[in-house]
Amino acid sequence: MTEPGSTGSVTISVHRRKPSSMTQSDQHHRPGSEGEHYVQEVLGTTDRADRFYRDQMLDHLNPAMREFIARQEMLFIATADLKGECDSSFRAGPPGFVHVIDDHTLAYPEYRGNGVFASAGNVIQNPHIGLMFLDFQRERIGLHVNGRVKLTEDERLRSHVTDLPLPQVPGQRALMWMVVQVEEAYIHCRKHIPHLRKVGADESWGTDDMMRKGGDFFGAKQEREARERHSPSPTAAATGWL
C-alpha cells in the first residue's frame, strides 16, 4: 500500500484494518495531519491516537504549560521553507527567555548568531513551526507546541508587551522576535528523557570568540581549505598552468 500523494516509492507493507466508521466531518475535526491519520488507519492505532488527542492535546497553553515554559532554558525548533525542505535548530537562554504573552501566544528572541537566519527565512515563506521544550533536569518531561509565526522587530514588540524579558547580554538586543500563535500543545512523555545535571559551565552569552563558540569542531572549514589547496585555481586552469 502506498502513501496518498506519493510516487509509489514509499510503501507500508501491512494489512489494512477495516475502514474506519468515522465520517469525513469527523476526520476533519480530528487534531493532527491527514498523513498521520492515514498511518494510524493502516497500523490500527486510530483509537489509541484519539485517546491521546482527547486527553492530552490542547489548542492553547494552560497554566501548567505556561509555568513549565517559564522555567525552561532550552528550546528545539523545526521549520520548513516553501518547498517543504526542513531545518531544525536550538535556542537557549536563562529561564523565561521564551516569553508566554497569553494562553495563545508566546515569543522568543532571534539574535544575529552566524548571520544565516535559516529559521527566520523559512517562516517568511512558510509560517508553520514546531517547538519542543525538554526538561532534562527537574521534571524529565517534554512539551510540544505547534503553531504559526510572525516575525516582529524588538522595539515594536516591546511597545506592546511591556514585560518582555531583557537581553541576555546587557546592550545586546534581539534583532527580532518569533511570535508564535499556538495551535497545538501536548505532552512528550518522560519514558526516554535522561536525567541531566548542570555542571556550572560558562554559557558565554553573546560571545563572538570562535573557540568559545566551538570553532571548526567538525572540521568543515579544514576540509574546504584542504580541497582548495589540492584543486587548481580557475585562473591557473584558464592559462594552462596546471
Segments (PLM) and residue ranges:
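Intrinsically disordered, low-complexity segments enriched in serine/proline and basic residues
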Residues: 1-4, 9-11
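Binding-site signature for planar aromatic cofactors or substrates
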Residues: 12-242
